[in-house]
Amino acid sequence: SYRTQLNGSLGHGRQGTYWGNLCHANRPTYAGSPHAQIQNSDSYSYTWENILSYNFSIANDHNFGVTGVTSWQKNSNEYTNADGSGQDLDIWKYWRLLAANSQRIESGLTTTQKMSYALRFNYSYKGKYLFTFSNRWDGVSFFSPGKKWDSFPAGALAWRVSDESFMKSSEKWLDNLKLRVGAGITGNSGGVGAYSTQTNAYKYTSAGITINGNIVPFTQYTGTYGSPSLGWEKSYNWNFGIDM
């Protein structure tokens, strides 16, 4: 059997705000008076998943199952903000920022992608002896080169004891008894920003900085330091159980 599923979403936002000379509530700290601001944002995301399964038997006693999965996810967010202070006319609000005495423009784009492959193999003999092995290969865009991809295997064994011939005498009061054990590795990429592995640089303008007696109007400084060693968080798990 084969199944495919595609989901997506689009988003758009626009907001304009004007603070007159007598309005100070929630006005940005860097803003003069009067002050106007316009904000625009666009976003989209989609996920595409595919599942392919195949089951077959040999001599009615040996049952096999193979399942393959792929998943692709992409998210993108873009924004543009523009500010202006010192407009001559209130009626201009945020529609004529070029007429402001000072302007400020900010924009940004954040894009992330995730890709996953998974393969699972099941085998059972007469429904009594069960074996499962699976492996996931996950990749994300926001880890450093060489650490974007990792593998997460898992396996399990089970024995349906109640189907054995020596359990016939107890089937009236114990008709289901299964022992199982499993182990595997799981991965976690949550909590990491889209560009956390990169060092950010910013331009500082303000009134300039003096270096060796000279005013440098535009300077660049380092923001958040990136961590190129960031990679997948792994958890090693095992379990044992008795089902009755």
Predicted regions and their residues:
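Extracellular/periplasmic, surface-exposed regions of secreted and cell-surface proteins
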Residues: 1-19, 31-244
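Low-complexity basic/metal-binding stretches
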Residues: 23-24
